[in-house]
Amino acid sequence: MTKEFNYGTGRRKTATARTRLYPGTGVIEINGRPYEEFFPRKTLQMIIRQPLVLTKMLEKFDVKVNVAGGGISGQAEAVRHGISRALLELDAELRPVLKRAGFLTRDARKKERKKYGLRAARARYQYSKR
């Protein structure tokens, strides 16, 4: 039995994207909506397409993504990470290309926690000398 789709999980900040790649015509769907509708910003749309454009597979696959958590920027980058991992599952020879572009690296930066005695993670309360 052959697999009908390739799967990849992408993460960024608190966003998680579960990505499935089906052989198709280049339709990208996020949470049941077209990606242009889900991410109206052109920069975020470009981020999502990057791995497919880089590997010249934009018109060869339909992408279905379920994304949750985080904000729009984190979600877009999580989707990019997920698509890259799914492409890797499809063809392991794409690893050097995707790795060089930095699409396989999980961006581990997260929000720093607030510390007690401070106003935020590093910001202090205003100091009054007198």
UniProtKB/Swiss-Prot annotation:
GO biological process, one term: translation
Keywords attached to this entry: Ribonucleoprotein, Ribosomal protein
GO cellular component, one term: cytosolic small ribosomal subunit
InterPro entries in alphabetical order: Ribosomal_Su5_D2-typ_SF, Ribosomal_uS9, Ribosomal_uS9_bac/plastid, Ribosomal_uS9_CS, Ribsml_uS5_D2-typ_fold_subgr
Gene Ontology molecular function: RNA binding; structural constituent of ribosome
HAMAP family membership: Ribosomal_uS9_B
PANTHER family: RIBOSOMAL PROTEIN S9, SMALL RIBOSOMAL SUBUNIT PROTEIN US9M
Protein name in UniProt: Small ribosomal subunit protein uS9
